[in-house]
């Protein structure tokens, strides 16, 4: 799974 992508997405959301 694309963990880096999820982290980036969460960072934008938060």
From Swiss-Prot:
GO cellular component: extracellular region
Keywords linked to the UniProt accession: Amphibian defense peptide, Antibiotic, Antimicrobial, Secreted
Coiled-coil spans in chain: none
Tissue specificity comment: Expressed by the skin glands.
Major localization class: secreted
Keyword 4Fe-4S tagged: no
Location relative to the cell: Secreted
GO biological process, one term: defense response to bacterium
Source species, domain of life: Eukaryota
Function noted in UniProt: Antibacterial activity against Gram-positive bacterium S.aureus (MIC=130 uM). Shows no detectable hemolytic activity towards human erythrocytes.
Entry's family note: Belongs to the frog skin active peptide (FSAP) family. Temporin subfamily.
Protein name according to UniProt: Ranatuerin-9
Annotated source species: Aquarana catesbeiana
């Amino acid at each position: 799974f694309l963990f880096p992508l999820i982290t980036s997405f969460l960072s934008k959301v938060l």
